[in-house]
């Protein structure tokens, strides 16, 4: 016999104070059944009122228990409500148990169960339930088709997606939502031709349909086709929405189409579409990857609610564009507004610390990541590389050894770090250890080792590594990256013929490849070869970069081609909009100093917008020694030691200048001053075998 139960007003179960008589509930339900009323719409039913008061999983389970205990679970409407609530709270297994207890679920209950899985992003279960639904012979329904197609899209399940398409063909009619879902499924599964066919079959195309097709092109790296389709969309007088413009900006990012990206940015502003966080991040990414860091910062500054993703995008942008100090400054500001960084932020900042060898800040960021628990493989690998770049091999090795699972990225981080800081033998030893631990290297590993061999000047080791790379197929699969490192190795080891042979075998040469070969000719004193290859590069419509101009200017300087050097230096900032770096100014100073045009060289040093470094001063003082212009040398010495009073390398330059003029006493005084200040010269070494 059913008993009356008083429900406690305990907060834990989420109920208000209420007494419910289940005898009354049963009588009401029986009355409704006798009247022929549908319990799907029995909003006033006590059972439904009870379930509607459930505000958490505990209260729902208690109510479920009460209904089961009183024999009220045979009704399909109550089961449907329970399934819906379990799905809403994220307990799909409980929902499925209720569903399976109904011997003959109606179509509405099937749809509710399907919606539960969709709501909780259980796409595999959506596809399984859809198959089961079709086997039961239920009628076709647009909502069911849409949810099943969405699940196939998320799973990249092309086979089941095609099955649904075949079932759709048998349906007399269905709405555009289903067709757009089908289009989206094909596009995201890489079947762009099938997606385009579906697109052409849609007669009334709305903005969602157009955007899905454009997004399909962009996702499959057919960005130009996506932009053409957008023009067709405009011709059809369909206005884009936030997602349309987000997709178009992504296309411009992939194409490095800065001008087009700016145009879409302008369209966004004119359209009055509110810039969401997602759109702002897309704009930041576009400007950053197109090298327009100033516009990226402008977008960042203009947005009132800057979230973690935007901060991170801006910091990563500065780091990748070489503006490391700005990246680190922004990171400090981010800490000031109490936004907790994530692993991507930390890894990017550590990368920046390594690039400018800021060990102090790198250690501070390391401590912060431990303190607030921001740690993953990317952070560990960035730490290894940062310590290696800062010549802290022991710390780099310690972090590396502490990683429980060393993947290929971890090995590459320490090998490339050691290669770049001059610890060549350690890098080669780690490579041998990597092989002994059965870790398969990749193109990045081999490229780092070629750089190590180039620094070591070891033609024999590098040639063996070349043979190893051919055996493993790296020159075929990673031809540009590995091939460029290989030709650079041969060029630096004095074998330009082998370098040119490798250069000619690389089918898709990038700017770095051309620059490496141009630099290789320059290192051998073949300025004509460098300049001819540079002109060939321009004819191939390859845009030079800063490294290309460094190689060209260096080649002109070593062969006394002053007029040509001046022409290329001027072209660099006038024709290509590059801001000269310290390296470019050093090349110009070296070229003029070698040619005896020391007054012009001094004028460059004094007017440089950035601080000259030891190489720049060294190039000038070397010219002073060559042409016995010690009067000009004295001017630079004063400027140099005022700027760098505690750097031994500058004192060595001064001592060498005095020695070249036979002023041995003054050279000795400089050496004694170094000892008094505790400064010592770093020992040099030969890099040729």
UniProtKB/Swiss-Prot annotation:
Please classify the protein's predominant subcellular localization into one broad category: mitochondrion
**Mind listing the GO biological process terms from this record?**
response to abscisic acid; response to oxidative stress; response to salt stress; RNA modification
Q: Where would I find the PPR repeats?
A: 75-105, 106-140, 141-171, 175-205, 206-240, 241-275, 276-306, 307-341, 342-372, 376-406, 407-441, 442-476, 479-509, 510-544, 545-580, 581-611
Listed GO molecular functions? RNA binding
Could you tell me the keywords of this UniProt record? Answer: Mitochondrion, Repeat, Transit peptide
What's a GO cellular component annotated to this UniProt protein? mitochondrion
Q: Which domain of life is it from?
A: Eukaryota
Q: Where is this region: Type E motif?
A: 616-689
List the subcellular locations: Mitochondrion
Transit peptide start-stop: 1-12
PANTHER family found in the cross-reference section: OS06G0185700 PROTEIN (PTHR24015:SF1951), OS07G0578800 PROTEIN-RELATED (PTHR24015)
Concerning its family, UniProt says: Belongs to the PPR family. PCMP-E subfamily.
Provide the protein name. Pentatricopeptide repeat-containing protein At2g03380, mitochondrial
Q: Which organism is it from?
A: Arabidopsis thaliana (Mouse-ear cress)
């Amino acid at each position: 016999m059913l008993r009356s139960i008083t429900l406690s007003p305990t907060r834990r179960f989420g109920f208000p104070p209420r007494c419910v008589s289940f005898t009354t509930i049963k009588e009401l339900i029986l009355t409704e059944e006798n009247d022929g009323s549908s319990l799907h719409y029995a909003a006033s039913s006590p059972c439904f009122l009870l379930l509607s008061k459930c505000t958490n999983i505990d209260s729902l389970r208690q109510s479920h228990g009460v209904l089961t205990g009183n024999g009220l679970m045979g009704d399909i409407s109550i089961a449907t409500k329970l399934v819906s609530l379990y799905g809403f709270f994220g307990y799909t297994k409980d929902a499925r148990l209720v569903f399976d207890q109904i011997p003959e679920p109606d179509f509405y209950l099937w749809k509710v169960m399907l919606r539960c899985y969709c709501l909780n992003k259980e796409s595999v279960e959506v596809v399984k339930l859809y198959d089961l639904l079709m086997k039961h012979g239920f009628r076709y329904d647009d909502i069911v088709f849409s949810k099943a197609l969405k699940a196939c899209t998320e799973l990249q399940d092309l086979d089941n997606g095609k099955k649904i398409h075949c079932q759709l063909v048998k349906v007399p009619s269905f709405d555009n939502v289903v067709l757009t879902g089908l289009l989206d499924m094909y596009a995201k599964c890489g079947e762009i031709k099938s997606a385009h066919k579906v697109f052409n079959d849609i007669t009334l195309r709305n903005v969602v349909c157009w955007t899905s097709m454009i997004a399909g092109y962009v996702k499959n790296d057919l960005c130009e086709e996506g932009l053409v389709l957008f023009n067709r969309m405009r011709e059809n007088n369909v206005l884009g929405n936030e997602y349309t413009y987000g997709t178009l900006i992504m296309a411009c990012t992939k194409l490095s189409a800065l001008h087009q990206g700016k145009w879409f940015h302008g369209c966004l502003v004119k359209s009055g579409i509110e810039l969401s966080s997602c759109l702002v991040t897309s704009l930041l990414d576009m400007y950053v990857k197109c090298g327009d860091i100033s516009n990226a910062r402008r977008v960042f500054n203009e947005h009132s609610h800057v979230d973690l993703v935007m901060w991170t995008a801006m910091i990563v942008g500065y780091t990748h564009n070489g503006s490391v100090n700005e990246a680190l400054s922004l990171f400090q500001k981010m800490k000031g507004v109490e936004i907790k960084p994530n692993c991507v932020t930390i890894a990017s900042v550590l990368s920046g610390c390594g690039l400018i060898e800021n060990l102090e800040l790198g250690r501070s960021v390391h401590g912060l990541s431990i303190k607030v628990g921001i740690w993953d493989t990317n952070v560990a690998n960035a730490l290894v590389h940062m310590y290696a770049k800062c010549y802290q091999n022991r710390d780099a090795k310690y972090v590396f050894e502490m990683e429980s699972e060393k993947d290929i990225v971890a090995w590459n981080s320490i090998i490339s770090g050691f290669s770049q800081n001059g610890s060549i033998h350690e890098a080669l030893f780690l490579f041998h250890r990597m092989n002994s631990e059965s870790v398969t290297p990749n193109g990045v590993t081999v490229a780092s080792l070629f750089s190590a061999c180039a620094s070591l000047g070891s033609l024999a080791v590098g040639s063996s590594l070349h043979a190893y790379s051919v055996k493993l197929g790296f020159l075929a699969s990673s031809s540009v990256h590995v091939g460029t490192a290989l030709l650079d190795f041969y060029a630096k080891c004095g074998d330009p013929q082998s370098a040119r042979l490798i250069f000619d075998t690389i089918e898709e040469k990038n700017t770095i490849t051309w620059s490496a070969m141009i630099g290789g000719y320059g290192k051998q004193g073949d300025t004509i070869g460098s300049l001819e290859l540079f002109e060939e590069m321009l004819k191939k419509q390859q845009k030079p970069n800063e490294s290309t101009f460094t190689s060209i200017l260096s080649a002109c300087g070593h062969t006394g081609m002053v007029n040509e050097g001046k022409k290329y230096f001027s072209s660099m900032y006038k024709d290509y909009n590059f801001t000269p770096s310290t390296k470019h100014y050093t090349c110009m100073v070296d070229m003029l100093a070698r040619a005896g045009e020391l007054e012009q060289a001094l004028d460059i040093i004094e007017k440089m917008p950035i601080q000259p470094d030891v190489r720049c001063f060294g190039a000038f003082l070397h010219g002073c020694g060559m042409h016995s212009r010690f009067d000009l040398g004295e001017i630079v010495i004063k400027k140099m030691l005022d700027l760098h009073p505690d750097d031994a390398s500058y004192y060595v330059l001064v001592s060498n200048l005095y020695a070249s003029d036979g002023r041995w006493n003054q050279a000795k005084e400089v050496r004694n001053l170094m000892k008094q200040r505790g400064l010592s010269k770093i020992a040099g070494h030969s890099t040729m075998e």
